[in-house]
């Protein structure tokens, strides 16, 4: 039986048009895409009719990134295929797979994804990268931005780019040389403006998932690398992330956690530098109010 891919009835659009946030818009139509051709078809139809399109992966966003009153493109779980290198250090995942499922694929290799958002059981690769998710454990070190190796992207005009393929890069340069030149001009403009350069460098020393990754103009000299890293955190506004190849991180077999009490918040903050030297992957500060909220809970 052929699976229905288009919904326009009020009940289904209401159900599928929600995410984990507090905001509400009802899409006019929901398109379920399971391959690149589906994506290109929907983008072409929206271009022809002048309708906007919003991408939805797991729908775990809290800020309304996946709601729309126009066309909603929902990624099917069977979109694309998984490919893992011999030692598991590189892994290509399609946009429709959840972070938890990706880690299940990597577990036999003793590896895992760098980004580990709290919603990893439901959040899918496309959304994790498009929102530059990292979770509490890895901050700015092993987030999506710093662990991607390659990406397959579909743009609004239907153009396809596989950054791992020299042939795809050549084809894209022939059709989109203007875009690549603009990226390099933006980079030159930043380099010629010391104040702008310093501001970008200081901004991205801290954990920052908001807005476009302007640091890509300073971190990379190749326009394809700049473009790929601009996709991270772009929330679907620059193109459709079809698949991502990650540089995976070790999944340590031995793990431990500790609850440490300090006489004051000041003393707790003084422990940050020593904890960094111990390579602690995550630390959470809880004040008396936080402890009071759970002190009567069993366990």
Model-derived regions, located:
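Short acidic loop-to-helix transition motifs that present clustered carboxylates
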Residues: 13, 36-39, 121, 267, ...
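C-terminal substrate-binding/cap subdomain adjacent to the FAD-binding core in PCMH-type
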Residues: 130, 138-141, 148-299
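N-terminal glycine-rich flavin-associated loop
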Residues: 20-53, 71, 75-117, 129, ...
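Conserved A3 ("GATE") glycine/threonine-rich loop of ANL adenylate-forming enzymes
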Residues: 60, 119-129, 234
């Amino acid at each position: 039986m052929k699976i229905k891919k288009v919904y326009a009835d009020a009940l289904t659009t209401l159900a599928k048009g929600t995410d984990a946030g507090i905001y509400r818009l009802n899409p006019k139509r929901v398109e379920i895409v399971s391959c690149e051709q589906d994506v290109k078809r929907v983008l072409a139809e929206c271009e022809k009719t002048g309708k906007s399109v919003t991408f939805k992966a797991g729908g775990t966003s809290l800020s309304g990134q996946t709601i729309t009153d126009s066309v909603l493109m929902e990624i099917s779980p069977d979109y694309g295929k998984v490919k893992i290198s011999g030692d598991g250090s590189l892994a290509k995942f399609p946009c429709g797979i959840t972070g938890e499922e990706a880690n299940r694929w990597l577990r036999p290799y003793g590896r895992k994804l760098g980004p580990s958002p709290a919603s990893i059981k439901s959040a899918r690769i496309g959304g994790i990268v498009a929102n530059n998710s990292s979770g509490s454990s890895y901050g700015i070190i092993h987030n999506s931005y710093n662990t991607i190796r390659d990406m397959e992207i579909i743009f609004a005009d239907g153009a396809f780019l596989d950054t791992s393929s020299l042939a795809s890069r050549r084809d894209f340069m022939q059709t989109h040389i203007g875009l690549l030149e603009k990226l390099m001009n933006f980079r030159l403009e930043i380099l010629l403006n010391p104040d702008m350069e310093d501001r970008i460098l200081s901004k991205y020393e801290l954990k920052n998932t908001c807005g476009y990754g302007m640091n890509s103009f300073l971190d990379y000299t190749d326009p394809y690398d700049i473009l790929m890293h601009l996709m991270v955190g772009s929330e679907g506004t620059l193109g459709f992330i079809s698949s991502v190849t990650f540089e995976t991180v070790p999944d340590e077999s031995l793990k431990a956690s500790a609850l440490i009490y300090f006489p004051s918040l000041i003393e707790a903050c003084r422990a940050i530098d020593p904890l960094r030297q111990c390579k602690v992957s995550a630390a959470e500060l809880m004040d008396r109010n936080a402890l009071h909220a759970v002190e009567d809970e069993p366990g």
